[in-house]
Amino acid sequence: MNIRFSMLVCVSFIFFTGGCAESSANSNDGSKNKNESKEESSEEGVKENDNKLADTPNMDDCIEVYGKEECEQITEYYKSEEGQKELDASETDKYSAKSQTSTTHKDIYEKVSWLVKEMFGVPERTIPADYEKSLVEKRDDGLYYIQSSYEIKGTGNQADTYYEFEMLMDNKYNLIDAYFPGSTGRYSRPMVYDKLKNMEIPEVKKVSPEEEKREEKKREETMKSIYGEEHIKDNK
């Protein structure tokens, strides 16, 4: 494999593993001189390799960028043992990243479930919805938005009650804000975190010592005009 092709393989690895080349047609039939067992083994290997590339889009996309000859070389490379190792490693990395994200969201929801059960003082009768039936999204600001529901089991003649809620939580499992419709207290109103965060806080105007003296003198003159100078002196 010449230097140009090696560099092209490195540059186009993401292109192919991300789905930018089409599976080429089935490999040419093995040599007629090979025995039957070797032919079967070769066919199985080709099928396995084709399956890994089968979900890639049109070969024309690759040809448009790299040219037909080089794209065919790259396709053949990813059918080789070395190319398959790279594809397998890429799939493993994508699976690990997906699992890590899923686990993080589940961890967040486990904390949310615990908070919901403890919030109303009847944890033994409070049943949060399952993670699969809930919405957990990570926002651009790093906070997690949770939308779900819970059920409080009734006692005696009381019926079971069903409620929905939404919540904001950071990655350290701190409750930032929440909204529990029908409840009482702090979280009985819609969430206000975003509204407060986006409010413009007026700038505190700094007053110089000279300005303070002028303001103080103005106040004294006002008091004198109201109560008289003698009254002001007596109260100093």
Curated annotation (Swiss-Prot):
A lipid is attached at residue 20 (S-diacylglycerol cysteine). Keywords: Cell membrane, Lipoprotein, Membrane, Palmitate, Signal. This is SPbeta prophage-derived uncharacterized lipoprotein YokB. PROSITE patterns: PROKAR_LIPOPROTEIN (PS51257). Residues 31-53 have a biased composition (Basic and acidic residues). Residues 1-19 form the signal peptide. A lipid is attached at residue 20 (N-palmitoyl cysteine). Residues 23-59, 204-236 are annotated as: Disordered. The lineage of its organism: Bacteria, Bacillati, Bacillota, Bacilli, Bacillales. Its main location: membrane. It comes from Bacillus subtilis (strain 168). It is a lipid-anchor. One of its GO terms (cellular component) is plasma membrane. Disulfide bonds: none annotated. It comes from the Bacteria. It is found in: Cell membrane.
